[in-house]
């Protein structure tokens, strides 16, 4: 790996994405890789997906000591609901995941993005709104809301009938409906994702958007309704226009 990174470094590449979906599944290996990545600071930023429920104290110590800009983290939390995670057969306890996520979001030397997945079994639309509120309170660097996709050969696709999930037979095989979220509600979740990208995930407006979310639990509902009714949710807007809309 060191040799490959040396080649990458020699070509002036500034960003490397590690494709391991659970970088810290093996804490010892994760620690060794972090020390290897450190050799290429400040020239390369490494993008990792990390499981917040599997953060050992030793790994936390390593993360605290890293220089700013070395890592860009994605915490694949998917949902903040225990029944949803259990039904989806996600590893780790929710309490551990939340504790780990709070820790990651508190680090000033790296940015942590949190992912939620609409269309997971048992996951309701109102719970998605509540989870966004919680993540905003954690000060997540970005909140990314995606729709579940049932790729051929995956366990979730094999269990689709059992779980009451209807999905498109065509790529990208997006979930269309579950027992807990309707077709229309999934469309609302997609519009909510656009809202997050346009406002919360935009650095210029993140602090204001976070403050509005945390000061009023109904803000996201009302703001999304306004953007939809005004036909703004699918329209590209300049930074200045977004500020005026807020």
Model-derived features with residue positions:
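Proline-aspartate-enriched helix->loop->beta-strand connector
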Residues: 13, 140-141
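Catalytic cores of alpha/beta
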Residues: 58-63, 121-139
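Short acidic (Asp/Glu) and glycine-rich catalytic loops that position anionic groups and cofactors
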Residues: 12-15, 42, 165-173, 204-207, ...
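Non-cysteine beta-strand/loop elements that form the S-adenosyl-L-methionine
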Residues: 60-80, 141-150, 156, 166-168
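Radical SAM enzyme core and accessory elements
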Residues: 191-246
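Short secondary-structure boundary/capping segments
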Residues: 32-36, 89-93, 127-131, 157-165
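Alpha-amylase-like alpha-glycosidases and glucanotransferases acting on alpha-linked glucans and related
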Residues: 98, 133, 161, 166-202
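Conserved SAM/AdoMet-binding glycine-rich loop
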Residues: 1-121
């Amino acid at each position: 790996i060191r040799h490959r990174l040396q080649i990458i470094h020699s070509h002036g590449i500034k960003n490397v994405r590690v494709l391991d979906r659970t970088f810290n599944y093996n804490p010892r290996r994760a620690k060794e890789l972090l020390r290897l990545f450190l050799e290429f600071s400040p020239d390369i930023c490494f993008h990792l997906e990390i499981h917040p429920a599997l953060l050992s104290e030793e790994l936390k110590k390593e993360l605290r000591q890293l220089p700013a800009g070395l890592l860009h983290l994605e915490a694949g939390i998917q949902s903040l609901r225990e029944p949803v995670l259990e039904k989806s057969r996600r590893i780790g306890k929710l309490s551990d995941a939340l504790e780990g996520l709070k820790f990651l979001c508190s680090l000033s030397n790296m940015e942590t993005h949190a992912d939620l997945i609409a269309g997971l079994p048992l996951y309701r639309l109102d719970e998605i709104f509540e989870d966004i509120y919680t993540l905003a309170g954690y000060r997540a660097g970005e909140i990314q809301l995606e729709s579940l996709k049932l790729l051929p050969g995956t366990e979730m696709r094999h269990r689709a009938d059992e779980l009451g999930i209807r999905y498109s037979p065509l790529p990208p095989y997006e979930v269309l409906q579950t027992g807990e979220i309707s077709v229309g509600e999934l469309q609302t979740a997609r519009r909510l994702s656009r809202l997050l990208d346009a406002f919360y995930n935009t650095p210029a407006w993140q602090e204001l958007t976070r403050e509005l979310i945390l000061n009023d639990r109904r803000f996201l509902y009302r703001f999304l309704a306004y953007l939809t009714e005004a036909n703004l949710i699918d329209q590209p807007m300049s930074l200045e226009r977004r500020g005026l809309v807020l």
